[in-house]
A protein has these predicted regions:
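N-terminal glycine-rich, Lys/His-bearing helix-loop that initiates the first secondary-structure elements
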Residues: 1-38, 429, 433-436, 465-466, ...
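Conserved N-terminal alpha-helix of the aminotransferase class I/II PLP-enzyme fold
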Residues: 36-79
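Short glycine-rich or small-residue beta-strand-to-loop segments that form or flank ligand, phosphate
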Residues: 74-76, 154-157, 346-351
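Short, compositionally biased
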Residues: 116, 121, 457-468
Length: 478
């Protein structure tokens, strides 16, 4: 079988001269940066066209489908974002209704806006003990599908940013009873199915459309992803059409070569790669379970590649109440950069590229920090500074208008403390993970404003706002 990276390398070393894009012309002496100009080409003879794949790229995508246990697979060079946009818009009619998990990524909300959809939200259960939003239960979906008979598709996130996994097989069975597709955002689970230590790939559990971000948990360059289609309920032709419209018309051959090499590694070397990784990960997790105060969070249905460490209700020996942001800063002093900090925890994202040395550094740093922590009941004064009441729980808000309707309304900017009761005309995200706290068209509550204020005070990044410390709301108070 021919592989893209090898073919690009051979072409780059040949005497073919480029009278075509890109403008660097593979001239390695032109620029000081040692970037891979030599293999950066456009759609020339012999290298196929991603938007009309008939040769090499068609064969490679078919091989990716085989490796990831899908019926049909597409390379994505615009990340999972373009896959989610294409899947949602391809599986729904304009103005239709969609059932979606409230913790979906913002790209799903953008698809809802672009297709003028009417969303029905499924709110994941929230754990007071861990401050994690949990799985989506099949009973929730069953109830809402029965209540809203015009739902055209269901979208859920599994695993979540924190690694929580839902029962895809049971959910798919219910959804298919209504002859509609189940779209699974498995962006954080591209490694699923390649080792028994991790959950199964959603392609094997009945999902109709699955999106994998290769770059998140497998050895591939940033922005690389896959979209898989299975079964008979997803409209394949419409999904393909949206991919052609929304994905770059100049797909990077460097990124596609990265996808090819990643798929090839998972096909030919998965046991060697994954066994080494899992052994290293298991050892780290076992050592972290011995912590006295900091807690390694685990759940019943969980992706163990995510190391979630909680400092909930903890103080250091100086009496400082800890939170996820402060814990992240402490780890940064050890030159360890976490994936994300939330109210009471941090996430250390692991993958096959991790080394024993890297894992040892993490464990040693956390153990040292743990020695300088007190585990005691926080006083009322302490609770003014803790995140107990501002954990990232999905708070239901009234949908006064659709996001599309809100996007066409006249608005005004008001201070946060003046926004309660008004209709928001913009998104409010805590980033990461990029899940909206407020969606355009929703009525703002004092509770959500309080959460925003406290997160801001603690140094978290609140995004989506057109003006700092203000919210764009509908012009006429209701």
């Amino acid at each position: 079988m021919e592989y893209l990276y090898e073919k690009l390398t051979a072409y780059g070393n040949s005497d073919y001269y480029a009278f075509h894009m890109p403008g660097h012309k593979r001239n390695m002496e032109l620029m000081r940066a040692r970037l891979p100009y030599n293999i950066d080409i456009t759609e020339i003879d012999g290298f196929d066209d991603l938007h009309h794949a008939e040769g090499l790229l068609r064969e490679l995508q078919e091989n990716a489908a085989k490796v990831f246990h899908a019926e049909e697979t597409h390379y994505l060079v615009n990340g999972s974002t373009v896959g989610l946009l294409s899947a949602v818009m391809g599986c729904t009619e304009r103005g239709g209704r969609i059932l979606m998990a409230r913790n979906c990524h913002k790209s799903v909300y953008n698809a809802v806006y672009m297709n003028e959809l009417r969303p029905v939200y499924i709110y994941p259960e929230f754990s007071e003990e861990t401050d994690l939003n949990g799985e989506i239960h099949v009973d929730q979906i069953k109830k809402l599908l029965k209540e809203y008979e015009d739902i055209q598709a269901v979208v859920i996130v599994s695993p979540t940013y924190e690694g929580v996994v839902s029962d895809i097989e049971a959910i798919a069975e219910i959804v298919h009873g209504y002859k509609i597709p189940l779209i699974v955002d498995e962006a954080h689970g591209a490694h699923f199915g390649f080792h028994s230590y991790f959950p199964q790939n959603a392609n094997t559990r009945g999902a109709d459309v699955v999106i994998h971000s290769l770059h998140k948990t497998l050895p591939s360059l940033t922005q690389t992803a896959l979209l898989h289609i299975n079964g008979r309920y997803a409209d394949r032709e419409r999904i393909r059409n949206y991919l052609h419209m929304l994905q770059s018309s100049s797909p990077s051959y460097i990124l596609m070569a990265s996808i090819d090499e990643c798929v090839r590694a998972m096909d030919e070397c998965r046991e060697e790669i994954m066994d080494t990784y899992v052994e290293c990960l298991q050892q780290a997790r076992e050592r972290l379970k011995q912590l006295r105060n900091i807690k390694l969070i685990e759940a019943e249905h969980y992706d163990r590649s995510k190391i979630v460490l909680s400092v909930k209700n903890l103080k250091n020996t100086d009496g400082e109440v800890l939170n996820g942001k402060r814990f992240q800063e402490m780890l940064r002093s050890y030159h360890l950069e976490m994936e994300m900090a939330s109210g009471s925890y941090v996430i250390a994202m692991t993958g096959p590229g991790d080394t024993q040395e890297g894992m040892d550094r993490l464990v040693q740093a956390v153990m040292e920090i743990d020695k300088n922590i007190l585990c005691e009941e926080l006083s009322g004064k302490d609770e003014d500074h803790t995140i107990k009441n501002i954990s990232y729980e999905m708070i239901p808000l009234e949908q006064a208008y659709s996001s599309f309707e809100a996007g066409r309304m006249e608005g005004e900017s008001v201070k946060w403390n003046e926004a309660s009761g008004r209709i928001s005309l913009e998104y409010v995200y805590l980033y990461p993970p990029g899940i909206p706290m407020i969606v355009p068209g929703e009525r703002i509550t004092s509770t959500i404003v309080q959460k925003m204020v406290k997160y801001k005070e603690m140094g978290f990044s609140i995004e989506g706002l057109s003006q700092e410390n203000c919210l764009l709301v509908a012009g006429n108070p209701e």
